[in-house]
């Protein structure tokens, strides 16, 4: 875990890690979103050559984050899996068996379509739309937050959009990087899975974005 940045929200400390996770210090929660496990297997099943190592590398990063932070609970803000069951789901179960001591909760996303019995057997608690912990709420798509009545001080964590920003370099070149995106009312986590697309943000003046560049997390100054 070479790099992290502390971001404070409502007097709570959140550690943004280059591993594309957030660790909530006060509650010992590890938060991540959009792993899209099984996506590489889904593409290979369709005849598209995608290296099997991609999913293994994502799982190694996942396990490394758990070993480093030693969370009391892991909260996945949607899209743990990409599609119906395939061989990569079986591989996940093997890793999960080694991490049975860590409670896991999934706020279901639009890609989480495997049967509920599967999650039960994997020891993963599931929530359909919104999960609350104190004054912080967790939802896959921030648009679903409109259904929850906000009280003063409430703050949302979400995923779904795979946020990114474009950074210009020399020679009028630009590169796109995944980022943590914070507004006054909600945050959007970068996709944890590396075999995912990104959505280019246009942050407002009051927003904050923290860019993930290899082994670093950097505050993006517009």
How should each PLM-predicted stretch be described?
Residues 1-77, 82-222:
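Extended recognition/assembly regions associated with phosphoester-bond processing machinery
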